[in-house]
Amino acid sequence: PAGPSKPADAPAIKWTVPAGKHAPYVYFIRNGNRMKIGTTTDLRRRIRTLALRAENIALLFEGDQRREHEFHKQFAEHRIGNTEWFACEGTLADFVRDQTVRVFREEESK
């Protein structure tokens, strides 16, 4: 099957991180085998707060807390305790891979 050229556990998309305040984004940011699904209107600050780098961003979606909560429900089986962190395995890992492939295909068709 088609897929990104990098391993599933490596960030594959180089996202542009806006400076300062912006419309809300739901982000999937990786730290080892864990994925944080959160929302922010200042992505650059959030990355610094988490002591991570832009390269750790796996996916970005336009959306607010409602969309974030939809993702939390969708991947509830992978949730780590009562946090916004999820084990990046099973359906969550598949989703990240599939969305990465979708983004690459959209970029190629431009």
Please identify what each model-predicted range represents:
Residues 1-110:
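Non-catalytic accessory segments flanking enzymatic or RNA/DNA-binding domains
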